[in-house]
Amino acid sequence: MKKVAIFASGTGSNFEKIADDERLKDKISIELLVCDKKNAAVIKKAHDRNIKVFIFSAKDFESKEAYESVIFEKVKDLDYIFLAGYMRIISPYFLEKYKKTILNLHPSLLPKFKGKDAIEQAFNAGEKEIGISIHYVNEELDGGEVIAQRSFEVAGNDTIETVTEKVHKLEHKLYPEVILKLVEEALLKEH
């Protein structure tokens, strides 16, 4: 059993899919949700599942390093961190301290459309194929090694709303699958 933290900032739909995935139940224990928005819907989803929550507001700290130091103390003994709609950039300071695996889910086919509003950027650019990437987190924004990608062809009648919905469906399916594979491989190596 691997102990993990999930970092999220919004509704928590990916958090929910990971937490409720039956294949992961005996492989991971979600020890903590880290959230930077006190009114985020993901908080209730964590509470409903009896998962501890750490909520912080960046403005309550003198620096990014200050709040990341507090977060590090809470996650330092955990095996993995999974970013699921976490809207803050993990700093080199944190990456230097936390030497274990951090995964991120990004709603574009990296290396295209890094950063915020990736779905909208891809749609407005007239991309014929849109998708998602799951990658290791490193010091470069959305620049770590890509582990998995999935995509779909944009239909002529697609809108930004329908494309966003299709992206979320891909996320909800692929992220738990990638986590399962990663954890199963790690557990096999231990035996």
Predicted regions: what they are:
Residues 1-41, 45:
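N-terminal Rossmann-like dinucleotide-binding module
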Residues 13, 40-41, 62, 88-89, ...:
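Short alpha-helical
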Residues 16-20, 69-76, 173-176, 180:
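Amphipathic, non-transmembrane alpha-helical secondary structure
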Residues 21, 28, 87-190:
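Donor/substrate-binding cores of folate-linked one-carbon enzymes
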Residues 26-70:
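Short, surface-exposed acidic-centric catalytic microdomains
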Residues 70-98:
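A glycine-rich beta-strand to alpha-helix segment
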